[in-house]
Amino acid sequence: VYAGMVEAMDQAVGTVMDTLTELGLDDKTVVIFTSDNGGLSTSEGSPTSNLPLRAGKGWLYEGGIREPLIVRIPEGWQSTDGSVKRQPVSDAVVTSVDFFPTILSLVGIEGMPAQHVDGMNFVGPLLGHQDYQRGPVYWHYPHYGNQGGQPGAAVRDGAWKLIEWYDSGKTELFRLDVDPGEQFDVASQHAAKRDELLEKLHQWQQDIGALMPSVNGESKLNQLRW
């Protein structure tokens, strides 16, 4: 079933691209292909694998939050930041809130001064610029997932990534440039970096008014019989 769904998705994308060509719109259209989470690999039949990344959908490890991203832009496309070149691969960090300011730039529309924009324009990497700096990226996952994921939050800043697990209060720190599979927690060896990222994470949660989970002392869940 899973393989059939992947095949159907591939066919659907092909149908969209073929239709754009038939309508003469392929050289006037930007196509963005991505996903809302990593591949399903830890539950519900474990139909696939995200190796070398750890875990999958429903988890704060890279297997759960690192998704494919393909941006198809006609060569020579003029954005407000310059002419877009073909850029086969970029290792720039991008998150979904970055799409809005990026699309505005690609279609030549300036953002309204009163608009609040959480994301960052990533046309730079599409232009081949190597000096693009995204800054910290955050995730807030205050609930359990049916794939086995636990409540927590994460922040990535450059090569460093910190995860805070709400149930246990434990924090994990990883260097993704040398450990993309998140096998080696280096929080104890780099306590200053751990504390720095944890402070940034908590400040971000406060700034956005993140809803935090709390223990339900009256829960009867442990008495349920399935």
Go through the PLM ranges and name each one.
Residues A8-G45:
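Metal-dependent active-site segment of extracytoplasmic phospho-/sulfohydrolases and closely related
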Residues D18-L25, L104-I109, L127, A191, ...:
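Sec-exported extracytoplasmic/periplasmic mature domains
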Residues Q133-G135, L201-G217:
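Bilobed periplasmic-binding protein-like "clamshell/Venus-flytrap" ligand-binding domains
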Residues V1-G4, A8-T15, G24, T48, ...:
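Extracytoplasmic/secreted proteins, especially bacterial periplasmic and envelope-associated proteins
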Residues L25-V31, R66-E67, Q133-R134, G158-W160, ...:
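Loop/turn elements at helix/coil->beta-strand transitions in domains of secreted/extracellular proteins
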